[in-house]
Swiss-Prot record:
Belongs to the NifU family. GO terms for molecular function: 2 iron, 2 sulfur cluster binding; ferrous iron binding; iron-sulfur cluster binding; iron-sulfur cluster chaperone activity. It comes from Schizosaccharomyces pombe (strain 972 / ATCC 24843) (Fission yeast). InterPro entries: ISCU (IPR011339), NIF_FeS_clus_asmbl_NifU_N (IPR002871). Homodimer. Component of the core Fe-S cluster (ISC) assembly machinery. This is Iron sulfur cluster assembly protein 1, mitochondrial. Pfam families: NifU_N. Binds 1 [2Fe-2S] cluster per subunit. The gene is isu1. NCBIfam families: iscU (TIGR01999).
Length: 192
């Protein structure tokens, strides 16, 4: 590997893009300039790029996520939705606690994914708290995407959030249909 390419990697600039101009940049004077001045301009370039990539609403929910955590899986008033997107590796776990009136009184999430996935999870938890199960089941990913100003390439994150809340509601309802002390498998075999 040439001195130029090693220097560029240390600076954090993409070597494949600059390699086309290596004859100009590989001059000793230019290499010295990069070594002495890289810390002055590279962080600013990085900061400007990251600010442009995400909308302020996404950054707010990403930097200050609301309702992070878990709820006990064994609690009969808790429903859990676990969804994932194989294409990008995002995984969301969303848990809801429902009161006796069918209103979601607490919501928690844990998400492994990009900033848009975390922001979508955080936003949907603030959205559904206080809703009935029926209202929460009607949430559409377009509402989430519109509020967070997600670009088309990140719409799958809002779809995951929609799927997670619907899965949590479905899980909660299935737990309510299962009599205490039995399992769903035992009920199915008893009725067959």
């Amino acid at each position: 590997m040439s001195v130029f390419r090693r220097s560029v990697q240390c600076v954090g600039v993409l070597p494949s893009i600059l390699a086309q101009r290596s004859s100009l940049l590989a001059r000793p004077a230019n290499l010295q300039f990069l070594k002495t001045n890289s810390s002055k301009f590279v962080p600013q370039v990085t900061a400007n790029v990251s600010r442009r990539m995400y909308h302020k609403n996404v950054l707010d929910h990403y930097n200050n996520p609301r309702n992070v955590g878990t709820l006990p899986k064994g609690d009969p008033d808790v429903g859990i939705g676990l969804v994932g997107a194989p294409a990008c590796g995002d995984v969301m776990r969303l848990a809801i606690r429902v009161n006796k009136d069918g209103v979601i009184e607490d919501v928690k999430f844990k998400t492994f994914g990009c900033g848009s996935a975390i922001a979508s999870s955080s936003y949907v938890t603030t959205m559904v708290k206080g809703m009935t199960l029926e209202e929460a089941s009607k949430i559409k990913n377009t509402q989430i995407a519109k509020e967070l100003c997600l670009p088309p390439v990140k719409l799958h994150c809002s779809m995951l959030a929609e799927d997670a809340i619907k899965s949590a509601v479905k899980h909660y309802r299935s737990k309510q249909l299962t009599p205490v002390g039995t399992t769903a498998g035992a009920i199915e075999s008893a009725t067959a």
